[in-house]
Curated annotation (Swiss-Prot):
Subunit structure: Interacts with TTC29.
Keyword check for Cytoplasm: yes
Domain of life: Eukaryota
Residue runs in coiled coils: none
One GO location term (cellular component): axoneme
UniProt name for this protein: Protein TAX-1
Region of interest (Required for localization to the flagellum and for flagellar motility), residue spans: 129-363
PANTHER family associated with the record: ZINC FINGER MYND DOMAIN-CONTAINING PROTEIN 12 (PTHR46533:SF1)
Compartment(s) where it occurs, according to its Swiss-Prot or TrEMBL record: Cytoplasm, Cytoskeleton, Flagellum axoneme
InterPro entries listed in its UniProt record: TPR-like_helical_dom_sf (IPR011990), Zinc_finger_MYND_domain (IPR053248)
Gene: TAX-1
UniProt keyword list: Cell projection, Cilium, Cytoplasm, Cytoskeleton, Flagellum, Repeat, TPR repeat
Phenotypic consequence of gene deletion: RNAi-mediated knockdown results in reduced mobility due to defective flagellar beating.
Length: 363
């Protein structure tokens, strides 16, 4: 009967209990994280019997161990989410709990602990506890030095980047430059010096130079970021244009709507966190160059053109149109209406159906 409360007999209740999967971590929260971890650790060490007991025990340990790793990864991700949302104290508490469980599972000297140290360092930096953050990063550095064969360029790049941003926040700019330079080197080794992921290091380094009032060095690095991203965005946007044109050629009916949605898969594949960082970086460069050089400068126009292309990539065409039209107006005034730079901006407007003829962007 709908809405009625059903009574469960003891035998049925026991049977239902037996159906609970001990490896299920779907509904584990912070209050049940440690008890579930203890349960899984005991389960992993449970003895096996029968034929091929040794092989069965090994397979069992591997299976349960994989679940524990998933549980710890989820805890680390949740700790990071708390920090992103600005809840520093909760992120610190969650980070400490996660680190302690990782120490029990991996051992206190394992490289697998380093991401937890990075999180706690960033959390303490957010809370302006710079001394604590430096101490935590020093522990991470010691673990990396103790495990040279397991510490790859990725973890070294993150170590130096985290150190560099910490020292920048603490106004220790010279040592910040040293660490961010090391981070740039490792990212270049991993991805190449002209890869879009390496631009994050260039941007961090440029910001420190700007804080030190070394504006020539800062502007040179900002322009390096712009050049790398312009090359990348031209390529991925050209793919989107080509896909759209191909779709128009094969559409069956005149009233079919052809959009750019398919091509934007490259933006989605880049990841939400990376896209958020890129947005912050490109808007930051535009704002800095607008403030230093004014909106009418061709360098600022190039930054605004780049920002427009990025917004096209993430499918924010209305916002992109504002920046592209403004960049076109500035470029027309500086170079002339028939200059290749102006023509380039107009080509992208045509390809993405942004009207520009007779449009004057506000300066």
């Amino acid at each position: 009967m709908q809405g009625a409360n059903l009574k469960v007999l003891p035998s049925t209740r026991a049977a239902a209990k037996e159906l609970v999967d001990p490896l299920d971590i779907t509904n584990v929260g912070w209050s049940t994280l440690e008890p579930k971890f203890d349960e899984l650790m005991q389960l992993m060490d449970a003895p096996s019997s029968g034929i091929n007991a040794l092989a069965a025990r090994s397979a069992h340990r591997e299976k349960v161990g994989a679940v524990i790793e998933q549980l710890l990864t989820r805890a680390q991700d949740e700790s990071r989410r708390l920090l992103v949302e600005g809840n520093g104290e909760a992120a610190a508490e969650a980070g400490v709990k996660t680190l302690r469980l990782k120490e029990r599972f991996y051992g206190k000297g394992s490289v697998k602990l380093v991401p937890a140290h990075f999180h706690l360092a960033r959390t303490n930096q957010f809370l302006k506890r710079y001394g604590n953050a430096e101490e935590i990063l020093s522990l991470a550095h010691f673990i990396i030095l103790q495990n040279p064969d397991e510490a790859d360029a990725t973890i070294k790049a993150e170590l130096h980047q985290t150190f560099g941003l910490l020292y920048a926040a603490d106004n220790k700019l010279d040592v910040s430059v040293k660490h961010l330079t090391c981070a740039t080197y490792y990212l270049s080794v991993m991805n190449g010096p002209e890869h879009v992921l390496t631009t994050f290091a260039y941007f961090d380094l440029a910001n420190v130079f700007a804080t030190k009032a070394c504006m020539e060095a800062a502007m040179a690095l900002y322009d390096t970021v712009k050049n790398i991203w312009l090359k990348h965005l031209r390529r991925v946007l050209k793919d989107i244009v080509d896909e759209t044109m191909a779709a128009k050629l094969v559409k069956r009916y005149d009233d079919d709507e052809v959009t750019h949605e398919v091509g934007h898969a490259s933006a989605r594949a880049f990841g939400k966190e990376n896209l958020a960082d890129v947005s912050k970086m490109l808007f930051g460069i535009f704002s800095i160059q607008k403030e230093r050089l004014t909106i009418s400068h061709p360098t600022t126009a190039r930054a605004q053109f780049l920002l427009g292309l990025y917004l096209l990539w993430v499918n924010k065409n209305d916002e992109a149109a504002e920046h592209l039209l403004s960049a076109r107006t500035t470029s027309q005034k500086f170079y002339g209406e028939r200059h290749p730079i102006v023509q380039d901006i107009e080509d992208w407007c045509i390809w993405f159906e942004i009207p520009f003829r007779g449009v004057a962007a506000e300066q």
